[in-house]
Amino acid sequence: MTSPWTLPVPSTAAPFAPYGVPLASRLMLGSAGYPSPAVLGQALQASGCHVVTVGLRRSLAGGGEQAPIEQVRRLGLHLLPNTAGCRTAREAVALAHMARELYGTDWIKLEVVGDEHTLQPDPWGTLEAATALLRDGFKVFPYCTDDLVACRRLVDAGCQVLMPWGAPIGSGQGLLQVHALRTLRARLPQVPLVVDAGLGAPSQIGRAHV
C-alpha cells in the first residue's frame, strides 16, 4: 500500500489549497490494501488526512464495492479517484469521465503509465490526457516523473498540482532523486508537489529539504 506524501514546506509557505480548496493536512492516503473497511476508517482517522485516493478500475473489478467510499464520505474527506491501469491518454480520459459520473467529483488523479516494469508515467500521454481533462472541467492531479520540462508543460497546460514519483511504485526505495525534486520546488515555487510513489517509510520523506 503506497501513500503519497507532500514535500516539506517552510513554515511561511501558503496553506495547502489544491485548486483553491484549503486542506489542513498535506497527507493523502490510498484506500486499497486494508483488511476491512473498519480498519480503513481507523487509519483515515488516525492519519488526519483530508484526501483519499481510490482506483476506479479496482473498484469495478471488485464488483463496485462501495464500503471504502462510504467510509471516506462519512468522515467528510475529499475523494480523489485515479486512472490507475491506463496505458493511453484515451483510456485515462474515458476512465476519468466514468469516475466523475460515479463519485460526483471533478478531482482526478491522472495516471498514464508508459512502462509495464517500472510503472513510470508516460509524459506525452499524461500531457495529452491532462490537456483534454482540463478542457472538460476536471481538476487534474497528474502522476509524473521528476523531469522539470515535463512538469512545466503540465503546469503550462493548467495543472495546479503535481504528483512526481519518489521511486518506482511499490519499490519502497524512498526519494531516489532528491536533487531533481528540489529543482522542481525551486523552479515551480507556487505549485504544490505531492510525492506519489516509492516511499516505504515515513522517515524517507526526511531526505527532502526545501
Predicted segments, located by residue:
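N-terminal amphipathic alpha-helix/helix-capping segment at the start of soluble metabolic enzymes
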Residues: 1-30, 67
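Alpha/beta enzyme core
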Residues: 13-18, 32-54, 63-79, 86-207
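Short, basic, glycine/proline-bearing loop/turn elements
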Residues: 23-27, 50-55
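N-terminal start-of-chain detector that recognizes signal peptides
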Residues: 24-27, 81, 165-166
